[in-house]
Design a protein with these regions (language model features):
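Walker B catalytic acidic pair
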Residues: 24-26
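Conserved structured core elements
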Residues: 20, 44-47, 51, 74, ...
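Mechanochemical coupling/switch segment within NTP-driven translocation systems
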Residues: 1-20
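Flexible beta-alpha connector loops of hexameric P-loop NTPases
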Residues: 28-47
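N-terminal, helix-rich and Lys/Arg-enriched segments in bacterial and organellar proteins
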Residues: 18, 34-37, 49-52, 63, ...
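Conserved ATP-driven motor cores of ASCE-family P-loop NTPases powering translocation/secretion/packaging/pilus
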Residues: 54, 60-136
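Switch/coupling sub-region of P-loop NTPases
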Residues: 1-3, 39, 43, 52-56, ...
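Alpha-helix capping/termination and helix-coil
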Residues: 1, 5, 30-33, 61, ...
Length: 136
């Protein structure tokens, strides 16, 4: 939780709860390709709010988890991308790895046949767990 929220929680009987906003395929939410003017205005408002949360949210205990197949500058604006503290990438070519992690580690450290394997911006490689639907 952000420093300001922690300080607030130490001085009140009703602490702020963490809020986590998760969006899988954020590209679907922000892509302006082929959008008419009305839709572009709506998307600009959404982008503006996400940008504000990315910049200031941690101080209030609000966190973003945004996922997309290809987070290029046309989909996730730099203002949002630069304020995302933690990045994770699966197997990717060097261009995509550079976009996500600012390095080519996803290309170099994740084998092509490794399914469910990811690397963090700090270079930590980890394996995701495969859930069998019968187990759920």
């Amino acid at each position: 939780m952000g420093e300001n929220a922690q300080q607030y929680n130490e001085t009140t009987e009703q602490p702020l709860q963490r809020l986590i906003f998760t969006c899988d395929e954020v590209a679907e939410m922000l892509d302006k390709t082929g959008a008419d003017n009305e839709r572009k205005k709506l998307l600009a408002q959404i982008e503006n709010k996400l940008s504000t949360i990315a910049r200031q949210g941690r101080a209030f205990g609000i966190h973003l988890i945004l996922a997309t197949q290809r987070p290029d500058a046309t989909i996730i604006p730099g203002q949002i991308r630069n304020n995302m503290d933690f990045r994770v990438c699966g197997r990717a070519d060097s261009v995509l790895s550079q976009i996500i992690l600012d390095n080519t580690n996803a290309t170099e450290q994740i084998p092509k046949d490794a399914r469910g394997r990811f690397i963090t911006g700090d270079g930590i490689v980890f394996q995701g767990y495969l859930f069998d639907e019968g187990q759920l």
